[in-house]
C-alpha cells in the first residue's frame, strides 16, 4: 500500500495520506454495526446522543417562530423530564442566527450557522467569506462551511485548502466545521484525502454531509473519516472533532456512530466538544426509547 505526502499552503504543511483498504474498512464498519448497547448502558447512550446533537432546520420556509421553537426544544428536549440533557447546538441559516442567539441566551446550547454558499460552495471566495463574517457578527458560535468539491475533484487541492484557511480566519473565535459532502467525493480515498486537507487547513471539525443529497452519512464513510482524524492526531498532536449528518433518524443509528467513534478514537471523543450528530428528526426517536 503506497503512502503519499501531499503539501499544502505557503508554509509547506505536509500530510501523509495512506490509501484506504476498502474491503477491510467496510468489513470493520459492518462488524461495529453488530455491537449492541447493554441494557444498563442504554440510558447513558441515549443521553450522550442528545448531548452530542446539533438540532437542525435548514429549510427555505424557516421563520423566526420556527427557530424559536427549535431552540426551546434544544434547551428542554423533554419538558416532563428534567434529567434529559439539552442538545449541543442548533444549526440554522445565517439569517436566523440573531433569533437563535436570543432564544438560547443563558444556556449551554451553541448556535451553529451554515455559511459560505451552503450547500454547494459555488460562489466567489469573497462572497463566501462575507457570508461567514456576517454569521459571526450575528453571534454564531460555530460555522459550518462546505468543501469546494468542484476545485477538489478537479485536482486543485491547493485552492480548496486556501479557501478553508481563509474561512477559518474569517471565523475569529467561532469554531469551524468543514462539510466534505462525502456522497459526492466518489471513493474512500477521496474522503480520506479531503479529511486530511480540511484538518491541515485548520478545521476544528470535519463533517460528513449537508443533508441535501441522498448519499449522505454512512458507517463506512464515518469510519473512514474517524481513521483520518486518528492518524492526523498521531502526526500532528492536534485533535479534530467529527460530525455525522444526513439521514440519521433513529436512536439505533446514533448508537452505531457512537460505537464507531469510541472504538476508533477513544472515549475522549465521546463528548459534544469532539463529536456531533446533525439531525432534525432524530431527537424524537431518541426520546421515545
Regions found by a protein language model. Give the residues of each.
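Alpha/beta enzyme core
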Residues: 40-48, 61-85, 95-242, 249-280, ...
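A short, histidine- and acid-enriched strand-loop-helix "catalytic/donor-clamping" loop
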Residues: 58
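Charged, compositionally biased N-terminal leader segments and the immediate start
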Residues: 1-50
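N-terminal start-of-chain detector that recognizes signal peptides
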Residues: 20-24, 28-31, 84, 215-216, ...
Amino acid at each position: 500500500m503506497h503512502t503519499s505526502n501531499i503539501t499544502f499552503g505557503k508554509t509547506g504543511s505536509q500530510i501523509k495520506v495512506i490509501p484506504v483498504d476498502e474491503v477491510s474498512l467496510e468489513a470493520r464498519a459492518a462488524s461495529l454495526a453488530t455491537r449492541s448497547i447493554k441494557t444498563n448502558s442504554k440510558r447513558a447512550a441515549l443521553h450522550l446522543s442528545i448531548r452530542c446533537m446539533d438540532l437542525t432546520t435548514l429549510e427555505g420556509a424557516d421563520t423566526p417562530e420556527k427557530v424559536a421553537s427549535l431552540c426551546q426544544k434544544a434547551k428542554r428536549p423533554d419538558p416532563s423530564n428534567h434529567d434529559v440533557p439539552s442538545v449541543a447546538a442548533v444549526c440554522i441559516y445565517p439569517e436566523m442566527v440573531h433569533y437563535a442567539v436570543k432564544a438560547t441566551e443563558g444556556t449551554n446550547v451553541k448556535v451553529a450557522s451554515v455559511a459560505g454558499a451552503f450547500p454547494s460552495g459555488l460562489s466567489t471566495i469573497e462572497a463566501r467569506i462575507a457570508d461567514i463574517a456576517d454569521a459571526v457578527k450575528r453571534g454564531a458560535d460555530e460555522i459550518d462551511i462546505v468543501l469546494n468539491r468542484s476545485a477538489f475533484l478537479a485536482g486543485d487541492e491547493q485552492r480548496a485548502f486556501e479557501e478553508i484557511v481563509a474561512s477559518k480566519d474569517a471565523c475569529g473565535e467561532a469554531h469551524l466545521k468543514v462539510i466534505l459532502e462525502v456522497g459526492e467525493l466518489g471513493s474512500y480515498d477521496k474522503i480520506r484525502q479531503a479529511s486530511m486537507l480540511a484538518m491541515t487547513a485548520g478545521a476544528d471539525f470535519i463533517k460528513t454531509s449537508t443533508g441535501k443529497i441522498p448519499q449522505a452519512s454512512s458507517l463506512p464513510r464515518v469510519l473512514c473519516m474517524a481513521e483520518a482524524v486518528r492518524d492526523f492526531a498521531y502526526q500532528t498532536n492536534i485533535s479534530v472533532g467529527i460530525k455525522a449528518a444526513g439521514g440519521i433518524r433513529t436512536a439505533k443509528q446514533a448508537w452505531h456512530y457512537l460505537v464507531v467513534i469510541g472504538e476508533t478514537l477513544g472515549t475522549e471523543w465521546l463528548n459534544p466538544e469532539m463529536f456531533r450528530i446533525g439531525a432534525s428528526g432524530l431527537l424524537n426517536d431518541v426520546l421515545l426509547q
